[in-house]
């Protein structure tokens, strides 16, 4: 099996044959992002600007609280709360609609969720390229016990970009009887 910077994380996710590989991919990315944000990244100005702009969903905020050191969490919170205070509790006369929009916007974005989504797209592209070019990987892919329904839709949507001759072969994985049955 080919090993390069794009294939290694994909192969690592597909090697275990336990559950949905794309759920494992999401878990891996989530773990890496939570570790990253509570590590040295908290001192990088460009990362702090993004975390202040996007904030965190409740689930990822709780992960950061549980994982990070007190100092890293305190530094993240200090700048994030200052940004939230300016946007959601502005000084002076600000239309209520603008404040409501700012409060809602804070609930719609998450630094970790958006990075997971972006990185999942890259890893999914790598997965499909490996499936097209590497027979060993096709074998590994076909040995997965299942792909959960949310990820099944995501994978098929991405696979629709495959060449016309390849897409039906890829779909056969899901429509023909499995040797696991």
Language-model features: locations:
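Short, recurring structural edge motifs at helix starts
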Residues: 5-11, 40-51, 95-101, 132-138
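Short metal-coordination and nucleic-acid-contact micro-motifs, chiefly zinc-binding Cys/His arrays
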Residues: 16, 53, 103-106, 141-144
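Short cysteine-rich clusters marking metal-coordination/redox-active sites
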Residues: 20-23, 110-113
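Short recognition patches in nucleic-acid-associated and regulatory proteins
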Residues: 25-47, 117-138
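Cys/His-rich microdomains that often coordinate metals
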Residues: 27, 63-64, 117, 155
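Short amphipathic alpha-helical linker/capping segments at the junctions of internal repeats
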Residues: 39-42, 72-87, 128-135, 162-173
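Acidic (E/D-rich), amphipathic helical modules within compact regulatory domains
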Residues: 44-54, 58-91
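Conserved small/polar residues in nucleotide/adenosyl-binding loops
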Residues: 174-181
């Amino acid at each position: 099996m080919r090993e390069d910077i794009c294939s290694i994380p994909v192969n690592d996710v597909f090697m275990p044959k336990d559950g949905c590989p794309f759920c494992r991919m999401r878990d891996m990315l989530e773990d890496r992002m939570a570790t990253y944000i509570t590590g040295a990244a908290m001192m990088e100005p460009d990362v702090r600007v993004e975390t202040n702009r996007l904030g965190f969903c409740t689930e990822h905020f709780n992960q950061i609280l549980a994982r990070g050191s007190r100092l890293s969490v305190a530094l993240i919170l200090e700048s994030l709360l200052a940004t939230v205070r300016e946007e959601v509790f502005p000084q002076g006369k600000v239309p209520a609609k603008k404040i409501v929009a700012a409060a809602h916007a804070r609930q719609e974005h998450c630094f970790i969720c958006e990075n997971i989504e972006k990185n999942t797209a890259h890893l999914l592209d790598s997965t499909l390229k490996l499936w097209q070019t590497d027979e060993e990987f096709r074998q590994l892919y076909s040995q997965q016990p299942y792909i959960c329904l949310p990820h099944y839709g995501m994978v098929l949507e991405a696979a629709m970009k495959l060449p016309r001759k390849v897409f039906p072969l890829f779909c056969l994985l899901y429509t023909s009887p499995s040797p696991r049955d």
